[in-house]
C-alpha cells in the first residue's frame, strides 16, 4: 500500500511540473524593471496625467446601464398628484389663490377712446389731468379719491361727471373756463372734503355737500345772487372759506362756528352788521376759532362797526378809514 501511495504522489508532482508556465511565456515591461530608483518617481507622477476624460479609480465598480435604481418609480396616481401640485400655486393655508379680476387697469375710456389713466396720470387713488387741454371732465375710476384737472379748457361741470364716486375727497379745477355747474354736480358726494374752483368764470354756485372743510372759489364772477342763502350754515367742519376777487356785496351768513379763515378781499362789500360774527344777545360770547378775516380791497370802513369784532380774537384786516 505504501508503494502505491508513493506512486500517486509522484505522478501529481510530475503533472504540476509539466503544467507550470515557463519564463518565456511571462509578459512584462522590461523598461520598468530596468529603470533606476531616480526614474521611478517620474513613472508614477499622476500630476501629469491629462484630465480630458473621466478616470476610473482602482477597485471602483461603475454601475451598468441595465442596473435598476433602488428607488421604485412613482405610481401613476402619485405622479399626477405631483404634477398638479407643481402647476397649481398654493397659499400658506393650502388653499388656491383666487384669479385676479381685471376691471380696466388704465381706467374707463374717454370720449376719444383713450383710457383715462393713459391720457392722465393715475397714482393709487389720485388722478392728475393737469394741462392736457381737456374741454370736459374725463371718466374717472370708481376708487378715485383725489382729482386734479388744472389749467385746462373745461367750460361746464355736468351732474354725471362725478356720479357714483363715493370715495372722492378732493376736487381741484383751478384755471379752467368753467361758467356753468349743474345743480347736483357736487351735492351727492358723501366724502367730499375739499373743493377748489379758483380762476374760472363761475357766476352761480350750486348746492354743496355739508361735508366740506376747505372751499376756494376765488377769482370768479360771483355776484349778489351767486351764493345761495345759508349756503354754509350746516357745514360744521368747514375751516377755510376763500372768496377773494369776486363781485360779492355782502358777507354770506351764517358762518359755521368752526370756521378759522374767511378771505373776502377785493370784492364789493360795503357794510357789516353787529351780528355778522358775534352774538349781540350774549356779550360774553367769544368766537375763538375765527382768527383770519380778510376784508381789504372792499369799500367798507371797519371803524364804523366796532361792536362787530368784540368777540373775535383778532381784528379783521381791512380799511379803517
UniProtKB/Swiss-Prot annotation:
Residues 1-19 form the signal peptide. The keyword Heme does not apply. Glycans are attached at residues 60, 64, 95, 282. Residues 77-86 have a biased composition (Acidic residues). GO terms for cellular component: extracellular matrix; extracellular region. It comes from the Eukaryota. It is found in: Secreted, Extracellular space, Extracellular matrix. One of its GO terms (biological process) is bone development. Transmembrane segments: none annotated. Residues 105-142 form the LRRNT domain. LRR repeats lie at residues 143-164, 167-188, 191-212, 237-257, 258-279, 289-309. Residues 64-100 are annotated as: Disordered. Gene3D superfamilies: Ribonuclease Inhibitor. Disulfide bonds join 117-129, 278-311. The record marks 301 as: Not glycosylated. InterPro entries: Leu-rich_rpt, Leu-rich_rpt_typical-subtyp, LRR_dom_sf, LRRNT, Mimecan/Epiphycan/Opticin. The keyword Cytoplasm does not apply. A long and a short form present in approximately equimolar amounts may arise by proteolysis or cleavage by exopeptidases. The O-linked polysaccharides on Thr-60 and Ser-95 are probably the mucin type linked to GalNAc. There is one glycosaminoglycan chain, known to be dermatan sulfate, and it is probably the O-glycosylation at Ser-64. Keywords: Disulfide bond, Extracellular matrix, Glycoprotein, Leucine-rich repeat, Proteoglycan, Repeat, Secreted, Signal. Preferentially expressed in the zone of flattened chondrocytes of the developing limb cartilage. Pfam families: LRR_1 (PF00560), LRR_8 (PF13855), LRRNT (PF01462). May have a role in bone formation and also in establishing the ordered structure of cartilage through matrix organization. Belongs to the small leucine-rich proteoglycan (SLRP) family. SLRP class III subfamily. This is Epiphycan. It comes from Bos taurus. The gene is EPYC.
Amino acid at each position: 500500500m505504501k508503494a502505491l501511495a508513493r506512486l500517486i504522489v509522484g505522478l501529481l508532482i510530475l503533472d504540476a511540473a509539466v503544467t507550470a508556465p515557463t519564463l518565456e511565456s511571462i509578459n512584462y515591461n522590461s523598461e520598468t524593471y530596468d529603470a533606476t530608483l531616480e526614474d521611478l518617481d517620474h513613472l508614477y507622477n499622476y500630476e501629469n496625467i491629462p484630465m480630458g476624460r473621466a478616470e476610473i479609480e482602482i477597485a471602483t465598480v461603475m454601475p451598468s446601464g441595465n442596473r435598476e435604481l433602488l428607488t421604485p418609480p412613482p405610481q401613476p396616481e402619485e405622479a399626477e398628484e405631483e404634477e398638479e401640485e407643481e402647476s397649481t400655486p398654493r397659499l400658506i393655508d393650502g388653499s388656491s389663490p383666487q384669479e385676479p379680476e381685471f376691471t380696466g387697469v388704465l381706467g374707463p375710456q374717454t370720449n376719444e377712446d383713450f383710457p383715462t389713466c393713459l391720457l392722465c396720470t393715475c397714482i393709487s387713488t389720485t388722478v392728475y389731468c393737469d394741462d392736457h387741454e381737456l374741454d370736459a371732465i374725463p371718466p374717472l375710476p370708481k376708487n378715485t379719491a383725489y382729482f386734479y384737472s388744472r389749467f385746462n379748457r373745461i367750460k361746464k361741470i355736468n351732474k354725471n361727471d362725478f356720479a357714483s364716486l363715493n370715495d372722492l375727497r378732493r376736487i381741484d379745477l383751478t384755471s379752467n373756463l368753467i361758467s356753468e355747474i349743474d345743480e347736483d354736480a357736487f351735492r351727492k358726494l358723501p366724502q367730499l372734503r375739499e373743493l377748489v374752483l379758483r380762476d374760472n368764470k363761475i357766476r352761480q354756485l350750486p348746492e354743496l355737500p355739508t361735508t366740506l372743510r376747505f372751499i376756494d372759489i376765488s377769482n370768479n364772477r360771483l355776484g349778489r345772487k351767486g351764493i345761495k342763502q345759508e349756503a354754509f350754515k350746516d357745514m360744521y367742519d368747514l375751516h377755510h372759506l376763500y372768496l377773494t376777487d369776486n363781485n360779492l356785496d355782502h358777507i354770506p351768513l351764517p358762518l359755521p362756528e368752526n370756521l378759522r379763515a374767511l378771505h373776502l378781499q377785493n370784492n364789493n362789500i360795503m357794510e357789516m352788521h353787529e351780528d355778522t360774527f358775534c352774538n349781540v344777545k350774549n356779550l360774553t360770547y367769544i368766537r375763538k376759532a375765527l382768527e383770519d378775516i380778510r376784508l381789504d380791497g372792499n369799500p367798507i370802513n371797519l371803524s364804523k362797526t366796532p361792536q362787530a369784532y368784540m368777540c373775535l380774537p383778532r381784528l379783521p384786516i381791512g380799511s379803517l378809514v
